[in-house]
């Protein structure tokens, strides 16, 4: 059995115990109590699966948490703030653009647009986004630019469907790259976007995608009506 699985269960058991003591003092609100009940069922199921006693795991979890707290400073307890990173200038973000052969796809809460008339171009993807815990948090806007500075693609959040994850953004970027590469364009991603959206990338600045994914994704892009 993986040691991280066991220690994670032990810490979860102890933290549930702390929350239960809090609720016993009639300090928890309705959502708090509802989560407490659901988590209790979950812990019982995990305990049965792992073959671990919850009471014993709770004691072990207490020791782990106490050891961590002994090493913590007040500074470390502060919640990190989001950082806003910009690849694009204000002019690049606000500039209007026109598509000769418009294609559009909605992927979750993100809208992907591209001009399929663009062929045999070198294209770079730039984005403005926020970061927390050194990971992409919220995409503000992503645009695809040719070497001449023309905008040929875009990914933007849908106002009517707020909320997306870094995985949603990476999947949307994969769709956009696939569509652009289908027309023999060469696409690379800005260094800032690579750093915070992917842990690794190809030498040419292209994020890693499964083999043949670009053709599969290109076929999924639906015509804009």
From Swiss-Prot:
<keyword id="KW-0694">RNA-binding</keyword>
<comment type="similarity">
    <text>Belongs to the influenza A viruses NS1 family.</text>
</comment>
<feature type="region of interest" description="RNA-binding and homodimerization">
    <location>
        <begin position="1"/>
        <end position="73"/>
    </location>
</feature>
<dbReference type="GO" id="GO:0030430">
    <property type="term" value="C:host cell cytoplasm"/>
</dbReference>
<dbReference type="InterPro" id="IPR038064">
    <property type="entry name" value="NS1A_effect_dom-like_sf"/>
</dbReference>
<keyword id="KW-1088">Inhibition of host RIG-I by virus</keyword>
<keyword id="KW-1035">Host cytoplasm</keyword>
<dbReference type="InterPro" id="IPR004208">
    <property type="entry name" value="NS1"/>
</dbReference>
<dbReference type="GO" id="GO:0042025">
    <property type="term" value="C:host cell nucleus"/>
</dbReference>
<feature type="region of interest" description="Disordered">
    <location>
        <begin position="200"/>
        <end position="225"/>
    </location>
</feature>
<keyword id="KW-1114">Inhibition of host interferon signaling pathway by virus</keyword>
<dbReference type="GO" id="GO:0039502">
    <property type="term" value="P:symbiont-mediated suppression of host type I interferon-mediated signaling pathway"/>
</dbReference>
<dbReference type="Pfam" id="PF00600">
    <property type="entry name" value="Flu_NS1"/>
</dbReference>
<keyword id="KW-0922">Interferon antiviral system evasion</keyword>
<dbReference type="GO" id="GO:0030291">
    <property type="term" value="F:protein serine/threonine kinase inhibitor activity"/>
</dbReference>
<dbReference type="InterPro" id="IPR000256">
    <property type="entry name" value="NS1A"/>
</dbReference>
<dbReference type="GO" id="GO:0039580">
    <property type="term" value="P:symbiont-mediated suppression of host PKR/eIFalpha signaling"/>
</dbReference>
<dbReference type="GO" id="GO:0039524">
    <property type="term" value="P:symbiont-mediated suppression of host mRNA processing"/>
</dbReference>
<dbReference type="GO" id="GO:0039657">
    <property type="term" value="P:symbiont-mediated suppression of host gene expression"/>
</dbReference>
<comment type="function">
    <text>Inhibits post-transcriptional processing of cellular pre-mRNA, by binding and inhibiting two cellular proteins that are required for the 3'-end processing of cellular pre-mRNAs: the 30 kDa cleavage and polyadenylation specificity factor/CPSF4 and the poly(A)-binding protein 2/PABPN1. In turn, unprocessed 3' end pre-mRNAs accumulate in the host nucleus and are no longer exported to the cytoplasm. Cellular protein synthesis is thereby shut off very early after virus infection.</text>
</comment>
<keyword id="KW-1192">Host mRNA suppression by virus</keyword>
<comment type="subunit">
    <text>Homodimer. Interacts with host TRIM25 (via coiled coil); this interaction specifically inhibits TRIM25 multimerization and TRIM25-mediated RIGI CARD ubiquitination. Interacts with human EIF2AK2/PKR, CPSF4, IVNS1ABP and PABPN1.</text>
</comment>
<keyword id="KW-1102">Inhibition of host PKR by virus</keyword>
<feature type="region of interest" description="CPSF4-binding">
    <location>
        <begin position="175"/>
        <end position="210"/>
    </location>
</feature>
<protein>
    <recommendedName>
        <fullName>Non-structural protein 1</fullName>
    </recommendedName>
</protein>
<feature type="short sequence motif" description="Nuclear export signal">
    <location>
        <begin position="132"/>
        <end position="141"/>
    </location>
</feature>
<keyword id="KW-1090">Inhibition of host innate immune response by virus</keyword>
<feature type="region of interest" description="PABPN1-binding">
    <location>
        <begin position="218"/>
        <end position="225"/>
    </location>
</feature>
<dbReference type="GO" id="GO:0039540">
    <property type="term" value="P:symbiont-mediated suppression of host cytoplasmic pattern recognition receptor signaling pathway via inhibition of RIG-I activity"/>
</dbReference>
<keyword id="KW-1113">Inhibition of host RLR pathway by virus</keyword>
<dbReference type="InterPro" id="IPR009068">
    <property type="entry name" value="uS15_NS1_RNA-bd_sf"/>
</dbReference>
<keyword id="KW-1103">Inhibition of host pre-mRNA processing by virus</keyword>
<keyword id="KW-0945">Host-virus interaction</keyword>
<feature type="short sequence motif" description="Nuclear localization signal">
    <location>
        <begin position="34"/>
        <end position="38"/>
    </location>
</feature>
<keyword id="KW-1190">Host gene expression shutoff by virus</keyword>
<keyword id="KW-0899">Viral immunoevasion</keyword>
<keyword id="KW-1048">Host nucleus</keyword>
<keyword id="KW-1262">Eukaryotic host gene expression shutoff by virus</keyword>
<keyword id="KW-0832">Ubl conjugation</keyword>
<dbReference type="GO" id="GO:0003723">
    <property type="term" value="F:RNA binding"/>
</dbReference>
